[in-house]
UniProtKB/Swiss-Prot annotation:
Homodimer. It is an enzyme of class 6 (ligase). Pathway: Cofactor biosynthesis; NAD(+) biosynthesis; nicotinate D-ribonucleotide from nicotinate: step 1/1. Disulfide bonds: none annotated. Keywords: Cytoplasm, Ligase, Magnesium, Manganese, Metal-binding, Phosphoprotein, Pyridine nucleotide biosynthesis, Transferase. Transiently phosphorylated on a His residue during the reaction cycle. Phosphorylation strongly increases the affinity for substrates and increases the rate of nicotinate D-ribonucleotide production. Dephosphorylation regenerates the low-affinity form of the enzyme, leading to product release. Belongs to the NAPRTase family. Abundantly expressed in the small intestine, liver and kidney. GO terms for biological process: NAD biosynthetic process via the salvage pathway; response to oxidative stress. Its EC number is 6.3.4.21. It comes from Mus musculus (Mouse). This is Nicotinate phosphoribosyltransferase. Catalyzes the first step in the biosynthesis of NAD from nicotinic acid, the ATP-dependent synthesis of beta-nicotinate D-ribonucleotide from nicotinate and 5-phospho-D-ribose 1-phosphate. Helps prevent cellular oxidative stress via its role in NAD biosynthesis. It comes from the Eukaryota.
Amino acid sequence: MEMELDSEGRMVVRPLLTDLYQATMALGYWRAGRACEAAEFELFFRHCPFGGSFALSAGLQDCMRFLRAFRLRDADVQFLASVLPPDTDPAFFEHLRALDCSGVTVRALPEGSLAFPGVPLLQVSGPLLLVQLLETPLLCLVSYASLVATNAARLRLIAGPDKKLLEMGLRRAQGPDGGFTASIYSYLGGFDSSSNTLAGQLRGVPVAGTLAHSFVTSFSGSEVPPDPMLAPASSEGPTVDLPARVNLWLKRVCLYLGLEEQEPHPGERAAFVAYALAFPRAFQGLLDSYSVRRSGLPNFLAVALALGELGYRAVGVRLDSGDLLQQAKEIRGIFRTAGAQFQMPWLESVPIAVSNNIDESELMRLAQKGSEVNVIGIGTSVVTCPKQPSMGCVYKLVSVGGQPRIKLTEDPEKQTLPGSKAAFRFLGPDGSLLLDLLQLAEEPPPKAGQELRVWPRGTQEPCTVKPAQVEPLLRLYLQQGQLCEPLPSLDESRRFAQQSLSLLRPAHKQLQSPAVYPVALSEKLRALVDSLSARGPL
């Protein structure tokens, strides 16, 4: 898709990023005289993704930006006129030209919130024709963002708090927009950085990266740097011929490792020297272009030790093939002994980064106790979400003209919850999460310490709950087209997501066969559902 940027340098989603049937329904509403009827839709999901027990809500900021800028251009209206019946009343197209979101109100979960099945991520109210047109773009903006954020959060739970996670999936993503979105929301979900420089430029995602095998293999060893001299890190003292110092160190390193001096690949060494001259304060080596043990490691050590003499410290190595866990263990052992042998103790703590199509199961290995891996680069498994490539969000009508609406189907789990609703989160005395409650908006809010009878979804029996704390979940972000409160930054949403995840009970954080987090209905909402299920919609 053509990338169009707004005044803040962010990508624009246009109103015609939608399904044709939204336009045909809009014409139907207009012909029926119902275009301006008050209506409310809810955007939610029915099942937690990846077989888990939670999701993270994401994409709200993108939704607000889309809604505030919503306007059909002349070219948009002309295209719709070309695909709708030729005898369509021109007044309908004039109605479309005049549309904006000045009559739209949105309540939503804050970005980065824990979300559970059936609880609205967004509540969108306004004129029926308009809020119907918003369905597909809002689903597009929320579903993938929430899926990637949830996937990233799961990977962060596996990795634990100490491992650095680098998202590096841009080249594996489903197109440039998918790659850009994944970089943003994997960061929100708990990754530390991304390789995607556009995400860094436009959304402030920290960027990181190393070097590729192409850089290493492009050198043969015969290259002579135009300027081989390097000044000490302190800027005091004479400059040093770095390639010459590296060759001297190589002799000592090979003797120490029991290698012939000819074994380490000269082209690889030349590549490392070139990189070190360009980045003396950020030198890192990719060790597996030829042989980790016989070439990559000794070449890296020779360059790192030569830099160390000048007061610089290498910042890491990366492995991209083989048994990553075992190799990292062996390399760490050599770093420890080499640091002592050559009196450069900082070598012992040089970070070891790994990549190579890492998925959840491999991440579990790399994160196990005693692992010497420090940084884990994940691409395909975070951006494509292979375990579940779609969030399954839906956007359903819940009221028209102030009257509740319900969808009754042959599949009971696809039945909707009618009416305008409020949502609350109940917490226990220790601050852990107990359940989420859905009730009609007209009901008084529940209070802490108040015993309530509620109906957990998926059960036929009520239960009694007495929360120590009650938190309203849905906040008013857009009222009559006006933003009601400043939207948090990406970093603030990321911190909020991590804080929210910390409140989940361990049983709900399990990635395999987790306990189901309960979502319950108030007695009044349950009674309305039963009534409409028996009688059909009002």
